[in-house]
């Protein structure tokens, strides 16, 4: 249970991204309870400067050192410490005044700072799903060893967390998915999809990388892996349910057959706020769900033949070891390549699958293994794209 007799200091890893910006809005609306203590960005220097001037954090980090002088100069009139480089991300989260670390960086880059925060005993609000995809077993053990709670920020995992009942085992997790913009496309149509079509997500406001992952259903595959580590269930206990309206954020089925669901408007600020305030709920003026305005709620099975990435994620989870790390690295490479018009939509799954076959498999788990695996899988994926 959180101590709420003073403002809680939040370190936001990735404050200029979609989740980071929405987290700052939560802090803005609850500035009597939370303070943005540390803000970080990779390349978005102008936005980081703007955020720093509004929220007056203790420190900011610009991970790309090329932007250091620009940020330092722009904030020279304020008592804000300015750091640069990836190692600084790992350092700032250990500050004794930091209460909550929101991991909202995109991709593998979020792993090392999250590990540093866990080792420093910080309360973790986790939006960076790749951390658990790549190193779920290691992260879970570290969190256990350091008595650190990990609160999910993903809307689906937040929903599942809210549905759980202590002492009542889960029979099945029903993980909902919008199905993406190509849910009804034929295989022929999917083959010709463009990046502009893929970047137009029907429901959620997200960054470019995760929007493409949602279109391929790799995002949902990663959420399956994330759910396994967060909720200690087997792959066979996680069922993906396509629910295009995104009103039901996920469901839990118990051993007696009862199903609990968490519903709400698709607004990421709600799970962010809940992760900050747990076990309490804060009053908000977020849009309410109006049941009388709801159209039909529909449910479908996902098509793993048309959307191979979902099947590949399940396969990686069943294999275990460093295979999810291989999939994540290859996916980061092909996702960017697709956004750069270097490959077609169907090449995304093809390159990932070939990388899974070529990369060295190991069951060892350490940060060094994951770093080596990540580098090797990226190299293989780049070589496959270049062919």
Q: What do these predicted ranges mean?
A:
Residues 1-387:
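Catalytic, metal-anchored helix/loop core of enzyme active sites in primary metabolism
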